[in-house]
Amino acid sequence: MKTYLSDDRPQPESQIGAALESLAHTIHERRDAGEKSYTYRLLMGDLDKLLKKLVEEAHETTLAAKGIAALDAVAAAKPDAVDEKLRSAEVDHLRYEAGDVVYHLMVLLERCGISLDEFAAEMNSRMTMKFHYVKAWCF
């Protein structure tokens, strides 16, 4: 898998780190891209449009996950009833929709002035809290 970094920053150790850093950098640069850029319009336009898009993408992600769960339920009841190619396509669809959620969330964070490092610190702080809180956060 090729990882894209838009400048000479050192390569992050993980693919997810590299992907998120590259995306955050690109989103930040789009502030100067002008009206032709979709990201620019999300950053500089009506906040409600960005929020609506984030909710829409989250909804599509939940529907994709429900599709996988439905296939898994059918497969549990009747193991030969679900084609693995169909399930694989559903997983690909979930991955695609999750990417849309992450992109729109990162645009929102950029718009609100929250850096990727600040977001990572928030996530890390949640992982170091007492077990009962982390358990509740993770359902």
Q: Which role fits each region the language model picked out?
A:
Residues 1-98, 102-139:
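Flexible "arm" and connector segments at domain edges
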